[in-house]
């Protein structure tokens, strides 16, 4: 497997599991970088009489630089594009018993309508804290159910207190604006929370210091042109 980019970008591989390897750059991608990922798997002996059937490739171009910072203590979210502040939002993050995860997260996907069910996080629907409802303008920032989303029911708390079950609450208009602004892979940095993002739960690429990331399994960092894996509401 190779990662190539123009301009050349220093990065490294990291094995998160025997069947899962990630490549990340040392620093955030530069806007406009052209990236090609190639997996030469045809004829590869994977063991136990399993063989690669074909080669695969994917090319993409890095978009505009978007970095958002969510401060769960000041209850404010600052959104930047190309290092310029474009939006400042009052937010409500996770309450004390359901904190929002902190760390350097990324936008995973966007979905207009998500049916959120409190049973998925161990809260019965019949509980005073239970819920089962459609939630709109959902921007996912983790693989474990954390979103930035519309929350008209908590507008009274946005900018002053944390009352959510872990997600970041915005007004409907602001949630829509952030949803439409966001690109897959955008950086979303959360600070002030007591719960750190789990490096093994899909949020690990930017949680792990680069030196440690590069030295786990796959070896030292390399230019992109030569990088290869080696060894709630």
Where are the regions that the model predicts?
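Acidic, low-complexity Ser/Thr/Gly/Pro-rich repeat segments typical of extracellular/periplasmic
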Residues: 1-64
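Exported/periplasmic cell-wall-interacting domains
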Residues: 64, 102, 114, 118-233
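Conserved hydrophobic/aromatic pocket- or pore-lining residues that grip, position, or stack substrates
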Residues: 77, 107, 139
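Solvent-exposed coil/turn segments that connect beta secondary-structure elements
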Residues: 6, 18, 26-28, 34, ...
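Low-complexity, Pro/Ser/Thr- and charge-rich linker/hinge segments at domain boundaries
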Residues: 57-81, 99-103
């Amino acid at each position: 497997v190779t990662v190539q980019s123009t301009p050349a970008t220093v990065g490294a591989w990291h094995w998160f599991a025997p069947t899962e390897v990630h490549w990340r750059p040392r620093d955030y991608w530069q806007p406009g970088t052209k990236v090609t990922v190639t997996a030469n798997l045809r004829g590869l002996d994977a063991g136990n009489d399993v063989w690669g059937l074909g080669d695969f490739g994917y090319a993409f171009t890095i978009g505009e630089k978007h970095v958002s910072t969510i401060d769960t203590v000041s209850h404010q979210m600052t959104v930047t594009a190309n290092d310029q502040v474009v939006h400042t939002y009052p937010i409500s993050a996770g309450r004390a018993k359901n904190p929002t995860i902190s760390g350097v997260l990324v936008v995973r996907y966007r979905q207009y309508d998500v049916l959120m069910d409190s049973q998925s996080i161990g809260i019965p629907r019949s509980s005073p804290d239970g819920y089962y409802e459609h939630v709109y303008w959902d921007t996912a920032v983790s693989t474990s159910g954390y979103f930035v989303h519309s929350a008209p029911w908590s507008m009274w708390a946005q900018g002053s207190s944390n009352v959510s079950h872990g997600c970041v609450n915005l007004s409907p208009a602001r949630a829509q604006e952030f949803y439409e602004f966001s690109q897959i892979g955008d950086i979303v940095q959360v600070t002030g929370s007591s719960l750190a993002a789990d490096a093994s739960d899909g949020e690990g690429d930017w949680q792990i210091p680069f030196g440690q990331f590069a030295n786990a399994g796959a070896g030292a960092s390399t230019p992109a042109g030569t990088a290869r894996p080696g060894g709630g509401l």
